[in-house]
């Protein structure tokens, strides 16, 4: 009956004036709606109701598209006006600032797309953790094993599908409900920004995928042990076939393939597209409302992200263990990350961000031509050229396309090589990181606090080892999340890589054992709390009476007089020792009238008020997040853009630049952020302040670099170097990062068998040069030298052996 009804509808659509593509879309949506109802046999009345529902949804999509177009135009015009006003002398820098921020002392110069993405992500994570604590299931979530996670997943699916919950354990039910409800909250937030994402059970955890597992499906599924080795091989074709064979029985085929004609060929093409997209990491690209995961609006387009609907939660859980985020927790945080990046992008650039940014650039260029500023117009034109303009390297960072894979084998083995080199060379990174204390104090000085107080704050936090539970919660609501949760420590010294599960876990363990995890987390936590206390102390001061330094700090993030005089009146957080801290979460408690007043609009819908409140909160959170990574230097999107130039992993140029940039992310971040912060005073007309800032940065780096260098010498059993010697002073500046150029072994000396050029080019080429030297010795008959060099090369590239405490014992 159902097939006859659908055939009749199809015939009517063919005879109507509706375009073929649109007619097929309507029919596909009816089929999908049929699958969603879980009813096998449909009569004409039910099919008619489904058709009515589909038509209503398509009418809603039309309204959403119109609203998106209107709101996009407002964002575009506002951004154009902002760039022309604040960056009148350098509009190209203004466009870069929109994407990745700028050090120039302009209103909102740090409130970039990249920072909005980070702020939304952290806000989502912090809000989720608060929900876990509120429902007293945070410990269960943190310690859940595979069996518990499977049962939690069942609850998530049952809640999402509005069916009876079968789980008997109350805590597991509570945890499942919290995740399901929070998933819905995030999905609705997507839709607030212009998406039309359908309700899916477990939507937030469905977006994770491991391209390395997919590409090795034969091995992952252990097929070689089950069949003749000649029959099963690891070719790309066999891997995709193995993946299809595994996933197809687990899929709700009516729902998954609703936008196809259902033929075996169409299903096969659908799965081919999905597989190829996943192994290239294309599902991690954020591209706005229409193409977001689960979006209805572009479901019929070839480029839309494929949604794989599973029959049951167990089917999803089994698949995820093999080819997804491995476990529920990792899949959940992957989903949070994608949500934060997409929402942050849309909040700044609208529902079609890539297209809208180019339109912004074009409008800026046109206005400059009208203003007879031809030179600036040409620079802007070059910057916004598609595929080759200067903006590409920054856009690739914020939309994630730089992390897509174009050449799987090259990306995999190059990433593994760089991971091994990191774990073989960074064992003493925490000793070298002593210079962080100086950089920390310089940032506090820039904020308007004292340098000596900054040194004391950093050392005091390191000496404390661990904060009280209450202060940890306060730091968390300001956006602090420990690096052992977000796993970004490796990116501090390199451009970051996509790694398979095993190497990712090994690398996490390494950074815990070398002490860098504790060091970085402690200083970040201290920077957050210190700044939170500093801002709270200013709350009784009206905007016009603020110190120039503090006013400069907040205006960098678009916090003007109107905003400051509202947020300073909010309640503060109080720790057990009586200290007061600014409360970012209290922004959620601001009344709708206050939000409307800040927006300057009296008539706002509930959705618009929610968006305005979210944007205010993430702007304030962004201030704490951004400045904490100036205090504890980390490469931001701007730094990574210059290091990778938007080049994809797996390509020749992409891998070459990644090898070259290994271990250079941190020193380049010092140049871009710490030095750039001081040089920004030049553009602001304060030349003497710029000179003093640079001089203090370099001299302080030399002092702390000498301390670090001496500590490493003592660990090696050497005497401290003469501080008066010119070479020592120069080495100390390098060690402390004052000149902004690290050698690849964190200022180790260049080996005799390698060239300076190879060392500058990166550790990969350095080690390759050493291997070449071995063969060179062999051809000359100098076998003892070849053996010695071979021994050194092996010893120096064994992961974990160079941990500073192990290396001291090993060398001894």
Predicted regions, residues:
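Hydrophobic, often aromatic-rich secondary-structure segments at membrane interfaces
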Residues: 312-431, 435-729
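Structured, mid-chain assembly/scaffold modules that mediate subunit interfaces
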Residues: 142-248, 428, 436-439, 468, ...
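Short linear, low-complexity motifs centered on an aromatic residue
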Residues: 193-210, 448-462, 677-685, 782-788
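Small-residue (glycine/alanine-rich) low-complexity segments and short Gly/Pro motifs
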Residues: 678-792
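Low-complexity, small/polar and acidic-rich linker and loop segments
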Residues: 2-185, 189, 199-201, 205-217
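Long, charge-dense tracts
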Residues: 175-180, 208, 216-344
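Amphipathic, membrane-inserting segments
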Residues: 476-521, 747, 758, 763-812
């Amino acid at each position: 009956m159902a097939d006859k009804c659908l055939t009749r509808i199809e015939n009517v659509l063919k005879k109507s004036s509706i375009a073929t593509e649109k007619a097929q879309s309507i029919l596909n949506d009816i089929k999908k709606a049929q699958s969603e109802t879980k009813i096998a046999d449909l009569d004409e009345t039910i099919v008619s109701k489904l058709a009515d529902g589909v038509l209503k949804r398509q009418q809603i999509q039309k309204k959403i598209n119109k609203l998106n177009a209107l709101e996009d135009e407002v964002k575009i015009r506002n951004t154009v006006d902002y760039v022309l006003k604040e960056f009148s002398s350098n509009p190209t820098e203004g466009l870069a600032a929109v994407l990745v921020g700028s050090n120039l002392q302009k209103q909102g110069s740090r409130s970039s797309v990249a920072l909005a993405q980070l702020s939304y992500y952290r806000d989502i994570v912090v809000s989720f953790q608060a929900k876990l604590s509120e429902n007293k299931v945070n410990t269960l979530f943190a310690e859940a094993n595979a069996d518990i996670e499977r049962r939690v997943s069942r609850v998530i699916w049952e809640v999402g599908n509005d069916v009876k919950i079968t789980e008997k354990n109350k805590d597991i039910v509570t945890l499942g409900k919290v995740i399901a409800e929070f998933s819905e909250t995030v999905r609705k937030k997507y839709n607030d920004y212009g998406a039309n994402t359908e309700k899916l059970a477990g939507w937030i955890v469905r977006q994770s995928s491991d391209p390395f597992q997919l590409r090795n499906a034969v091995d992952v599924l252990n097929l070689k042990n089950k069949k003749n080795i000649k029959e099963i091989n690891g070719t790309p074709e066999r891997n995709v076939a193995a993946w299809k064979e595994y996933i197809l029985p687990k899929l709700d085929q009516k729902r998954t393939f609703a936008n196809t004609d259902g033929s075996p060929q169409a299903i096969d093409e659908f799965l081919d597209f999905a597989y190829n997209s996943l192994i290239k990491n294309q599902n991690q690209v954020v591209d706005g409302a229409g193409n977001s995961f689960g979006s209805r609006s572009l479901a019929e387009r070839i480029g839309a992200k494929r949604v794989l609907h599973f029959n049951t939660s167990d089917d999803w859980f089994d698949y995820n263990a093999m080819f997804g985020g491995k476990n529920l927790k990792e899949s959940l945080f992957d989903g949070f990350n994608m949500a934060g990046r997409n929402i942050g992008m849309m909040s700044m650039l609208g529902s079609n961000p890539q297209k809208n940014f180019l339109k912004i650039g074009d409008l800026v260029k046109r206005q400059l031509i009208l203003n007879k500023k031809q030179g600036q117009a040409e620079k802007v034109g070059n910057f916004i050229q598609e595929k080759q303009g200067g903006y590409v390297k920054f856009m690739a960072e914020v939309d994630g396309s730089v992390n897509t894979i174009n050449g799987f084998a090259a990306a995999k083995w190059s990433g593994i090589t760089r991971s091994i080199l990191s774990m073989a060379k960074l064992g003493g990174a925490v000793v070298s990181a002593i210079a962080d204390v100086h950089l920390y104090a310089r940032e506090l000085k820039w904020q308007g606090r004292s340098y000596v107080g900054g040194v004391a704050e950093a050392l005091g936090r390191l000496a404390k080892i661990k904060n009280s539970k209450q202060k940890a919660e306060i730091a968390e609501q300001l956006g602090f999340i420990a690096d052992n949760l977000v796993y970004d420590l490796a990116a501090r010294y390199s451009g970051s890589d996509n790694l398979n599960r095993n190497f990712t876990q090994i690398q996490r363990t390494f950074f815990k054992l070398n002490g860098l995890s504790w060091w970085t987390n402690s200083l970040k936590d201290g920077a957050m709390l210190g700044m939170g206390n500093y801002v709270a102390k200013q709350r009784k001061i009206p905007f016009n009476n603020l110190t120039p330094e503090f006013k400069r700090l907040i205006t960098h993030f678009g916090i003007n007089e109107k905003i400051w005089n509202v947020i300073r009146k909010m309640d503060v957080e109080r720790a057990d020792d009586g200290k007061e801290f600014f409360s970012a979460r209290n922004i959620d408690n601001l009344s709708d009238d206050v939000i409307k007043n800040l927006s300057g609009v009296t008539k706002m819908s509930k959705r618009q008020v929610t968006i305005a409140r979210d944007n205010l909160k993430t702007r304030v959170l962004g201030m704490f997040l951004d400045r904490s990574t100036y205090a504890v230097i980390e490469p931001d999107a701007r730094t990574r853009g210059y290091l990778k130039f938007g080049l994809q992993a797996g390509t020749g140029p992409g891998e070459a630049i990644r090898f070259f940039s290994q271990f250079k992310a941190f020193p380049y971040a010092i140049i871009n952020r710490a030095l750039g912060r001081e040089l920004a005073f030049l553009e602001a007309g304060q030349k003497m302040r710029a000179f003093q800032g640079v001089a203090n940065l370099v001299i302080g780096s030399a002092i702390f670099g000498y301390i670090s260098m001496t500590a490493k010498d003592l660990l090696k059993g050497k005497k401290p170097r003469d501080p008066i010697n010119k070479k020592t002073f120069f080495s100390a500046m390098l060690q402390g990062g004052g000149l902004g150029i690290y050698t690849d072994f964190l200022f180790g000396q260049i080996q005799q068998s390698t060239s300076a050029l190879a060392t500058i080019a990166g550790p990969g080429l350095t080690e390759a040069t050493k291997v070449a030297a071995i063969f060179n010795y062999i051809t000359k008959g100098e076998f003892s030298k070849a053996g010695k060099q071979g021994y050194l090369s092996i010893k120096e590239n064994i992961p974990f052996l160079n941990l500073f405490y192990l290396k001291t014992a090993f060398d001894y």
